[in-house]
Amino acid sequence: MARIAGVDLPREKRVEVGLTYIYGIGRPKANEILVKTGVNPDTRVRDLTDDEVNKIREIIDKEYKVEGDLRREIALNIKRLTEIGCYRGRRHRMGLPVRGQRTKTNARTRKGPSKPVSGKKK
């Protein structure tokens, strides 16, 4: 089983898809990596040679932030925004949408489940 960036890639999938199991690598980056290493995207992960796996691992380690490093950088960016007290930081702290979306209706993903408001008493 190919292990790249601390992630076991699924053996039965194509390399192009298998690389997307690594946090921070989607289809476009996976294709870019395969072009740089000269590996055919249609190859199955189980059919990769050790040399090809090492090439892929080398490119990812050198040129991309993935897994823990990427998660840490994102967390630090959010922490920095909250500490300086800018608008985006306040929105993160309050658990509201950060990028200007409306909140009168919708925004349930960020706000959590709706809190029922009791109707008018008779």
From Swiss-Prot:
What Gene Ontology terms for biological process does this UniProt record contain? Answer: translation
Q: Which gene encodes it?
A: rpsM
Q: Which UniProt keywords apply?
A: Ribonucleoprotein, Ribosomal protein, RNA-binding, rRNA-binding, tRNA-binding
Subunit architecture: Part of the 30S ribosomal subunit. Forms a loose heterodimer with protein S19. Forms two bridges to the 50S subunit in the 70S ribosome.
Taxonomic lineage of this organism? Bacteria, Bacillati, Bacillota, Clostridia, Eubacteriales
Q: Where is this region: Disordered?
A: 92-122
The record's function comment reads: Located at the top of the head of the 30S subunit, it contacts several helices of the 16S rRNA. In the 70S ribosome it contacts the 23S rRNA (bridge B1a) and protein L5 of the 50S subunit (bridge B1b), connecting the 2 subunits; these bridges are implicated in subunit movement. Contacts the tRNAs in the A and P-sites.
Q: What is this protein called?
A: Small ribosomal subunit protein uS13
One annotated GO molecular function: tRNA binding
Q: Where is the composition biased (Basic residues)?
A: 101-122
Look up keyword Acetylation and say if it applies: no
Query: What GO cellular component entries does it have?
Result: cytosol; small ribosomal subunit
Q: Does the keyword rRNA-binding apply?
A: yes
Q: What's this protein's family per the entry?
A: Belongs to the universal ribosomal protein uS13 family.
Q: According to its UniProt record, what is one Pfam family this protein matches?
A: Ribosomal_S13
Tree of life domain:
Bacteria
